[in-house]
Amino acid sequence: MPKIYRIKGKIVGKDEPMVFTKEYKAMKEEDAIEKIYSEIGSKHNVKRASIKIIEVSEISADEVQDPILQAVL
């Protein structure tokens, strides 16, 4: 059964650091982290070394804030 992960981090190396919080549905924590590296790297044209993960936490379906993820659940 997939779990829901909230990932907090920042992108360094640009003009000013960008802070982000994303929620993903994944089987393992590693899969969610891989997904964030892939998505942010492609959208913001940054390398994985510039993406710093601050916190990864597993959350319940009630705690989801992303409206798209809420619609899927």
Swiss-Prot record:
The keyword Zinc-finger does not apply. Pfam families: Ribosomal_L18A. Keywords: Ribonucleoprotein, Ribosomal protein, RNA-binding, rRNA-binding. It comes from Methanococcus aeolicus (strain ATCC BAA-1280 / DSM 17508 / OCM 812 / Nankai-3). The gene is rpl18a. It comes from the Archaea. This is Large ribosomal subunit protein eL20. Part of the 50S ribosomal subunit. Binds 23S rRNA. The keyword Membrane does not apply. One of its GO terms (cellular component) is ribosome. GO terms for molecular function: large ribosomal subunit rRNA binding; structural constituent of ribosome. Belongs to the eukaryotic ribosomal protein eL20 family. One of its GO terms (biological process) is translation.
